């Protein structure tokens, strides 16, 4: 069941990342049994790593914290709908549910290419029913607006 405080934590994580110049406005929180297991944010620029998206960063930390590669019974909160790469990692990690704020189209409006990759990879009709659920888009759009007004590197 959706809990807004976990999305707020993802937003805070994303803000910290963009304030440090680490990457885009993408933060994530992983929750298990109502407890935060890990948070992460986009570190593409900081780490010179095109795979270090917020969801991937959070998954890596959660797996280390739990000392397992299997995040069954975990939920992921993210400021944006996962790109195809992140979605694949989420599925590989066995995360049960994803709550997201902004859409791939919102990402494109601030300069990111997620929608392009989505078209290449195909639709999401094969996903389990209600696997992806959108919440708090307006809160996440505020974060995107803030980011869009910054001097930044788009990748």
Question: Could you say what each language-model-derived stretch is?
Answer:
Residues 1-19, 82, 89-155:
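Zinc-dependent deaminase
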Residues 5, 35, 57:
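Active-site phosphate/pyrophosphate-handling residues
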Residues 22-26, 72:
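Short, basic and Ser/Thr-rich N-terminal targeting/leader segments
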Residues 28, 67-68, 122-124:
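Short secondary-structure boundary/capping segments
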Residues 37-44:
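Short beta->alpha transition motifs characteristic of CBS
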Residues 48-52, 56-93:
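Helix-adjacent hinge/juxtasegments
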């Amino acid at each position: 069941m959706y809990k807004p405080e976990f999305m707020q934590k993802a937003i805070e994580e994303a803000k910290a990342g963009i304030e440090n110049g680490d990457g885009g406005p993408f933060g994530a929180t992983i929750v298990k049994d109502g407890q935060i297991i890990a948070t992460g944010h986009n570190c593409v620029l900081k780490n010179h790593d095109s795979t270090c998206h917020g969801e991937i960063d959070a998954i890596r930390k959660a797996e280390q914290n739990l000392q397992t590669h299997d995040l069954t019974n975990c939920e992921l909160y993210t400021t944006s709908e996962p790109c195809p790469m992140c979605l694949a990692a989420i599925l590989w990690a066995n995360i049960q549910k994803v709550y997201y704020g902004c859409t791939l189209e919102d990402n494109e409006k601030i300069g990111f290419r997620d929608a392009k990759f989505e078209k290449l990879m195909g639709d999401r009709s094969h996903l389990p029913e209600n696997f992806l659920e959108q919440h708090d888009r307006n809160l996440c759009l505020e974060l995107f607006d803030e980011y869009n007004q910054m001097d930044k590197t788009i990748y």
